[in-house]
């Protein structure tokens, strides 16, 4: 049974699962689907097009599936998909998709800290930690288990690899490959995210191989030559393949 405050508004066409808690001054719009066991504290707004899983907690001021901040948007029907077990803190805003991709996606088991923004058509993986006041422009992609510290600004269309860590206050105009620390101004490669990799259970052998991959990529002539040297020299584990595929498919170029 859902617990809905008499001071909340739930549109009659909204679809709610079971055991949800909806606090005072929450607003649930039409064309909304919500799973089970979600907690919406006071003053949470769930806009049209929201597709929310289960076991999420939304803190005061969170606004989900807002109208995209895109002048090309013409009111097309799009969605914002949120997975399970997310903690979405105070004043987080997540825009729904546009005609470009049709939906914004937030995976599962993420912590989105207060006052951060997820732009239209972004695709966020799972296991992410994104710090206070970090802003993601439209169509940003972040792979699983990345960490973005506070006040990070990410340019539209950027791709951030899994297990990467971006230092606080950084500006990211280019793609950030997996497993690394990115920092300084302008943004640069600052070594591997060794502490994060160890915490996630990576072995010394895996970490050493990732290190050697970047050593060859960044120190062997051109990037193309570095990729060729990696393929000739190192075993093609899933970590190495992930790095090479990320670099080869980068649309904005990678930080160096």
Where on the chain are the PLM-derived regions?
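Structural signal for interior beta-strand "rungs" in well-ordered beta-sheet cores
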Residues: 3-183, 187-188
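Terminal amphipathic alpha-helical/low-complexity segments used for targeting or macromolecular assembly
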Residues: 1-7, 12-13, 18-19, 55, ...
């Amino acid at each position: 049974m859902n617990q809905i405050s008499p001071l909340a508004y739930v549109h009659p066409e909204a679809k709610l699962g079971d055991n949800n808690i909806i606090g005072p001054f929450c607003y649930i719009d039409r064309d909304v689907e919500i799973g089970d066991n979600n907690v919406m504290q006071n003053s949470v707004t769930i806009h049209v097009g929201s597709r929310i899983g289960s076991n999420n907690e939304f803190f005061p001021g969170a606004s989900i599936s807002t109208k995209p901040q895109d002048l090309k948007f013409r009111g097309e029907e799009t969605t914002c998909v949120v997975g399970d077990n997310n903690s979405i803190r105070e004043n987080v805003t997540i825009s729904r998709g546009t005609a470009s991709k049709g939906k914004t996606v937030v995976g599962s088991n993420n912590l989105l800290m207060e006052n951060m923004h997820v732009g239209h058509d972004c695709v966020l993986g799972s296991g992410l930690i994104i710090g206070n006041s970090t802003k993601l422009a439209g169509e940003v992609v972040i792979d699983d288990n990345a960490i973005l510290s506070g006040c990070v600004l990410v340019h539209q269309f950027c791709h951030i690899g899994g297990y990467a860590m971006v230092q606080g206050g950084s500006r990211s105009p280019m793609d950030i490959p997996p497993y690394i620390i990115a920092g300084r101004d302008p943004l640069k490669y600052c070594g591997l995210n060794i502490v994060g990799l160890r915490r996630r259970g990576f072995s010394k052998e895996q970490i050493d191989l990732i290190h050697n991959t970047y050593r060859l990529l960044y120190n062997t002539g051109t990037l193309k030559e570095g990729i060729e040297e990696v393929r000739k020299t190192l075993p093609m584990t899933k970590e190495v393949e992930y790095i090479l595929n990320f670099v080869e498919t980068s649309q904005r170029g990678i930080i160096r």
